[in-house]
Amino acid sequence: MTVDTVTGPTARTGGEQAPPAAYPRPARRFLGLGSGQIVAVQLALVLLVGAMAAGVGYLLPAVPLAAALVVLAWGRWRGRWLSEWTAVYLRYRGRRRRIEPSGDAAELLAAAAPGSRLSTLDIEGVSCATFTDAEGMCVLLELGDQAVMPARGWHPLPSPATLLPAPGADTPPVRLQLLLHANAANGSSPAASSYRQLSGGRLLANERAVLAVRVQRAEGWQEADLQRALTGAVRKVRAKLGDVPHRLLGDVAALRALAEAAGHDGTSPAQEGWSALHIGGLYASSYAVERWPTPHPDPAHALLPRLLRLPATTVSVSLTAGPWADGGTTLQAELTVRLTAPDHTSLGNAGTALRQLLANEHAHARRLDGQQFDGLTATLPLAGPGPAALGAGGRGGVNRRPAAVAALATPYGGSGLMIGVNRHSEPVSFRLFRPEATRLVMIGGVAVAQILAVRAMALGAYVLVQTTRPWAWEPFSRGLGSGAPLAVMAPGPVNVPPGTPLRPLLSIVDAGPVAADRTPGTPWHSTLVVRDDLSPVDVDVLGRADLALLQPLQPAEAAVAVSVLGLSRDQEAWLSRAQPGMIGVVHRRSVRWAALSTTGYEQQLINATQQNGR
């Protein structure tokens, strides 16, 4: 397979106009048939009639040639016309299928949306990133509470069909895209298996929901008009979101969201194959859901959350709605799923699980063979053309009833690291790793810190321990075995690679009283300060922590915690009277209590450490 190197345009930041659209024009169809199919039959008939008129000898080559034309035009394979497969193959062979490494998302953006540029737009007093290309203009909103411990564990996200502004003669077409991206922590290490046993597979390592709002170019609409229309569309969408937490993304955050959704680490090239795309060290396959599931009245049977929990390294689900069609009675909608895995075997198993899940819901998906880069583009938060519009024929999304699209609402919030269970036997979790730096303080000793380290490894993290008591950590390190993502060293400056969603970084500081870290930190990097007890010297570091983990305290310690964390006197009493094995998770002046659950694997590691430490 020959590969062309990407040397084309990168993302522009100026005010230059976008070039003409590079996307294929929709093909005209009659009764579901392409015009090329009808022309092929006509050519075959003309060929046969001409051969008969010329003489019997001309029929010998004319008959197989005419038959080949008919078979090519009317033959079907794997649910598509052979002529469509031919067009897909020719387009696959004729385009660039490689994205070069880049320190930012510029090269990725240039490949996904040719001729695009990044600028900013002021919407309701907030400067947000705007992606402008030949299709139109787009802004991004991140949905969901991004706090380390959200106020609500679960909350529903509306379908883009319910958020789509009503059609109007004085507004350009609008398309919305809800992109869900999740890492299910499906590793094969002992730590990952232990954590799945603890959580029952209910919690994702991390998840992200991004809503893209796009206004499409229309005849007579100038750039300034599109900006005003986009501002109005975003205002209407935000009003419909109501109490759903959301924020507009600026330029840096938007580019980071784009790169993280693609899984492009910027250190290695991305290469498209026929059935899979190799990007960020993983293999990815995209699927277009062509027959949608029957809506289920029970939210527990919602399809989208179950898609996010497929046995893959990451899962991306894109649901688009719009523009309106048929006078506002239907709308174009597409559902695309992208799976990633470390090897082809695991990727095939994930694809089989996807098909089985959809079959149980009387739905069907088609793998985008020859269109894997189209699948990647469709699962980026750009609300651009989907695989149907980009592929052979350029047919665009299927027109569906708004109620059918609105039924695909999704519960959101089931991600994080599980610390234990509450009195209702429900998991208590918090987001140890986020797209921003996270600082934690744990009062209670090394054992709980080691449990957190094991569970962080299960989420894919690399753990760096800086300690003044190596004898407490070396038996733990030996118990994990060689090759474990753990390093134990003395306190001091250290250079570490930046964290990523799939490989976050946890720094554990077990060095007695320390000063609070006042640096801004980096995304996907969390710092856990471990203290055996709480004293006035810990006030600064505790007051600046995003989250505090408190085991039962002495009355004097509880008084310090209440003063620093802004807790009530009733909470102070609970902090000093809690039973052994309980842990309080403190965030934003609230305390959630959990029974510290441990697995057999974790108990084995901790017991070995305690025995060797005597």
Regions from the language model: what does each represent?
Residues 1-104, 426, 546-549, 568, ...:
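N-terminal alpha-helical membrane-insertion module
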Residues 2-19, 60-404, 448, 454, ...:
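Extended, folded cores of ATP/NTP-driven motor/assembly subunits in large transport
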Residues 127-131, 377-482, 588-614:
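Extended, compositionally biased accessory segments flanking or bridging domains
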Residues 145, 340-342, 442-446, 466-470, ...:
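Structural motif
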Residues 162-166, 513-542, 554-555:
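Substrate-engagement module of ASCE P-loop NTPases
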Residues 460, 503-505, 523-525, 542-547:
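Short, well-ordered alpha-helix to beta-strand connector turns
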Residues 477, 531-600:
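Conserved ATP-driven motor cores of ASCE-family P-loop NTPases powering translocation/secretion/packaging/pilus
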Residues 479-532:
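Conserved nucleotide-sensing/catalytic segment adjacent to the nucleotide-binding pocket
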